[in-house]
């Protein structure tokens, strides 16, 4: 259990390091390359599926750092790439079984995609980068926690 937690943290930190090490500091929406958001989205989805593979599983629910990955992706990589990664992670979640938790994850993904996109439209006008990242992270974690609470109360 602790090993999976450390593997997830390591995967997240390595993906952040490699992104900032090998990318141009110009934001994606200002670049001319149209294929770059798709490439970054596929990379985000691939990292999310790897994190899901090494997640901690309790009662069929996978616990990992995908929420953090999505918050960082929405803030620093861009909306289009993060949404592509979110779709890829959601499809990858169905590889682990077609159960009610997978469909709950689909609903969470739709909400996180819509709310994070709206937040990134309004937050930069009022807050600095760190505050925006904290708000996105809290949104993702609270949404996941609330959905997990609803799912667990319906089981009993």
Regions found by a protein language model. Give the residues of each.
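Hydrophobic transmembrane alpha-helices
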Residues: 1-70, 81-156
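Structural signal for the C-terminal ends of transmembrane alpha-helices
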Residues: 17-28, 77, 118-125
């Amino acid at each position: 259990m602790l090993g999976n937690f450390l593997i997830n943290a390591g995967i997240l930190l390595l993906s952040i390091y490699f992104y900032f090490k090998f990318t141009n500091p110009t934001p994606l929406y200002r670049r001319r390359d149209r294929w770059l958001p798709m490439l970054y989205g596929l990379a985000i989805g691939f990292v999310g599926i790897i994190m899901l593979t090494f997640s901690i599983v309790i009662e069929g629910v996978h616990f990992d750092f995908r929420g953090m990955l999505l918050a960082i992706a929405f803030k620093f990589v861009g909306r289009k790439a993060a949404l592509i990664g979110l779709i890829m992670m959601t499809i990858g979640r169905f590889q682990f079984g077609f159960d009610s938790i997978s469909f709950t994850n689909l609903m969470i993904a739709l909400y996180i995609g819509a709310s994070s996109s709206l937040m990134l439209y309004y937050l930069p006008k009022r807050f600095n980068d760190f505050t925006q990242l904290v708000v996105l992270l809290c949104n993702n974690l609270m949404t996941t926690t609330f959905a997990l609470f609803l799912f667990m109360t319906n089981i009993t």
